[in-house]
Design a protein with these regions (language model features):
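Expand to "…catalyze enediolate/carbanion chemistry for C-C bond making/breaking, isomerization
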Residues: 1-276
Length: 276
């Protein structure tokens, strides 16, 4: 399965069913969160909310399974087993495994398409093996949990940029996904009012090869979508470059003072794909 959800994936606490439909309408896909967004005493109620919204009329779920992701609790926990029992009674087959750390954890989910969320040191180190698993459709990294697992206090410097260890993890997960032909999802941007900072980070994510970015608030969706949507000028430039390549009929040619070869042409093709 090729992961095609995105570019804006919106988290929604699974114990807030009144928000499910709105989240799904505002974003390209909704992530119903059974993990960090739900307090331990409320997790069973959250699972019940997922089941309840399916209804008993036979009309099917209110949420489109092809645009719905369920973030489940870490493997090896009691809540992980309860989450799977809940999902067995639903049509939802795309899950995000929190704190994915090993191949064996992914193999415990044979009936699901999995977004492996690497947010611990072990998860980042084992990302290449995790990404290679057949049921893994995408890889995501998490900054704050990663730094917490290392005993750190913040993933970002005072200027808002990521610390070196977070940048390393971001790149490692992206490269692991790419090496196995899987999609990569960029981490959330926790400073909700800072839409300019979010936009800059989302533009970097798109340019670097992340296929989508996770959001924690509906106000972030439009900024992410805009970052992934090439401008008219970008589309025109990419089209002209590809036209020039066809006219040149050569593997390497010069265009507007630049040397153009295969990788540059693939960059242009990527721009046009994002525009469709």
């Amino acid at each position: 399965m090729t992961f095609v959800m995105g570019p804006a994936l919106l988290f929604c606490p699974a114990d807030r069913p009144e928000r499910f439909q709105k989240a799904a309408e505002r974003a390209d896909a909704v992530i119903l969160d059974l993990e960090d967004a739900v307090a331990a005493p409320d997790k069973q109620r959250a699972r019940g909310a997922i089941l309840a919204q399916l209804g008993g009329s036979g009309d099917g779920p209110e949420l489109d399974p092809s645009r719905t992701i369920i973030r489940i609790n870490p493997a090896g926990t009691e809540d992980f087993e309860k989450d799977l029992h809940c999902l067995a009674h639903t049509p939802y087959r795309t899950v995000m495994l929190a704190k994915a750390e090993s191949v064996s954890q992914l193999r415990a989910l044979p009936d699901f398409h999995v977004i492996a969320l690497c947010e611990t040191a072990a998860g980042v180190v084992h990302a290449p093996a995790i990404a290679a698993e057949p049921n893994v459709v995408a890889m995501m990294w998490g900054a704050e949990d990663l730094l917490a697992s290392l005993g750190g206090t913040s993933s970002r410097n005072d200027d808002g940029g990521y610390r070196a260890v977070a940048l390393h993890a971001r790149s490692a997960v992206l490269l692991a996904a790419g090496a196995s032909g899987k999609q990569a999802v960029d981490a959330v941007y926790v400073n909700i009012p800072d839409l300019d900072g979010l936009a800059a980070e989302a533009r970097d994510a798109a340019a670097s090869g992340f296929g989508s970015k996770a959001c924690i608030h509906p106000s972030q969706v439009s900024a992410v979508r805009a970052a992934y949507a090439p401008s008219g000028e970008d589309v025109a430039a990419a089209t002209e470059l590809l036209d020039a390549a066809r006219a040149a009929g050569a593997g390497v040619f010069q265009y507007q003072g630049r040397m153009i070869d295969g990788p540059i042409l693939r960059h242009a093709e990527s721009v046009l794909r994002r525009a469709t």
